[in-house]
């Protein structure tokens, strides 16, 4: 396994103003939690047609969005294509909310609108041995 040199936080929208005003931008949440001396962080604005790097020395974190994976925006289809390319070269990636959905959609999963609306919450997770590496 190659050494990862940096993390790319992929923003999929400016965020909801109500959330930004109370909690700040979601792209800043993760960078504030990660020690930048150990892992340099680049922020990529996919919704502005910036695309992440295809390199074995990078890890992607794809964030949430007010948009839906099935919306017809060019940046969404471009990001899906990049995700497939990244999977081919084994770029590790984490999807949060929209990010999770776009990874699955790129892989062919059907993503549909929830009849109950948005679901928001948190869950405890644990790292596998490979995740600890």
Regions found by a protein language model. Give the residues of each.
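N-terminal beta1-alpha1 cap of cysteine-dependent amidohydrolase-like domains
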Residues: 1-89
């Amino acid at each position: 396994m190659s050494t990862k040199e940096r993390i790319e936080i992929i923003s999929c929208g400016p965020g909801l103003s109500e959330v930004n005003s109370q909690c700040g931008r979601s792209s800043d949440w993760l960078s504030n939690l990660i020690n930048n001396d150990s892992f340099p962080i680049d922020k990529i604005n996919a919704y502005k047609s910036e695309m992440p790097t295809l390199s074995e020395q990078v890890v992607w974190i794809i964030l949430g969005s007010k948009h839906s994976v099935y919306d017809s925006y060019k940046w969404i289809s471009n990001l899906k294509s990049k995700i497939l390319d990244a999977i081919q070269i084994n770029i590790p990636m984490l999807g949060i909310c929209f990010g999770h959905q776009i990874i699955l959609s790129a892989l062919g999963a059907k993503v549909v609108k929830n009849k109950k609306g948005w679901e928001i919450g948190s869950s405890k997770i644990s790292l596998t041995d490979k995740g600890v590496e």
